[in-house]
Design a protein with these regions (language model features):
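Hydrophobic faces of well-ordered beta-strands that scaffold small-molecule active sites
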Residues: 18-24, 47-51, 94-98, 123-125, ...
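Glycine-enriched alpha-helix->loop->beta-strand junction motifs that scaffold or abut catalytic
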Residues: 45-46, 90, 119-122
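Alpha-helix-loop-beta-strand connector modules within alpha/beta enzyme cores
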Residues: 63-96, 142-171
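Catalytic domains of carbohydrate-active enzymes, especially glycoside hydrolases
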Residues: 36-52
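N-terminal amphipathic alpha-helix/helix-capping segment at the start of soluble metabolic enzymes
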Residues: 1-20, 165-172
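Glycine-rich, proline-tolerant flexible connector loops at the mouths of alpha/beta enzymes
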Residues: 25, 47-79, 131-139
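Flexible, glycine-rich active-site loops centered on histidine and acidic residues
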Residues: 104-152
């Protein structure tokens, strides 16, 4: 069900509903940690569950010559997978977050395609935070500066228009 419909239904019924937000676990922690956190919350009948998306971090490694090498690392990957696992296990709507920061339009398109294949049709489009090494938010060179641009990309994909300019016959499951 569309989250907007869930909210509108709660309003029309004058029923208080809530949702909770999950942080993907640190890389290396498995789904059991997520399920252990989610299990007691499901007894409270949440309207839906938000799954955050975290930007990449920068790890510095000092070389033998004293220079510094920078590595891009994702400490909390798994938003798409966690979203699918929670929806399947608990039969609750999930709202994975998609962010502009650290992702190209192509990365975002791939994530949206994966979400669609998994039957996940709600997303929360956000600009996202600046990276830890940035003074100000800097978009990916092939990405979006503002969340409204991300929303436009999502809307275009829903019309079958892809980043590479291809237009495909679109069906909505």
């Amino acid at each position: 069900m569309n989250v907007v419909d869930i909210i509108n239904k709660a309003i029309s019924e004058r029923r208080t509903r809530f949702a909770f937000e999950l942080l993907p676990p640190l890389k290396g922690d498995g789904m059991q940690k997520i399920f252990a956190a989610v299990e007691p919350l499901m007894a409270l009948d949440p309207a839906y569950v938000n799954i955050t998306f975290h930007r990449e971090g920068i790890k510095e490694t000092e070389r033998e010559d004293g220079s510094v090498e920078w590595h891009v690392v994702r400490r909390r990957p798994g938003t798409v997978g966690i979203s699918a696992a929670i929806q399947k296990k608990y039969d609750v709507e999930v709202v994975p977050h998609l962010i502009c920061g650290g992702q190209s339009k192509y990365d975002i398109e791939d994530a949206l395609i994966d979400l669609d294949f998994l039957g996940l049709h709600n997303v929360l489009a956000l600009r996202g935070d600046k990276s830890q090494n940035e003074k100000f938010f800097m978009p990916h060179p092939q990405g979006h500066t503002h969340a409204v641009d991300l929303v436009r990309q999502i809307a275009a994909m829903n019309r079958g228009q892809f980043v590479d300019g291809e237009v495909e016959e679109c069906h909505h499951s």
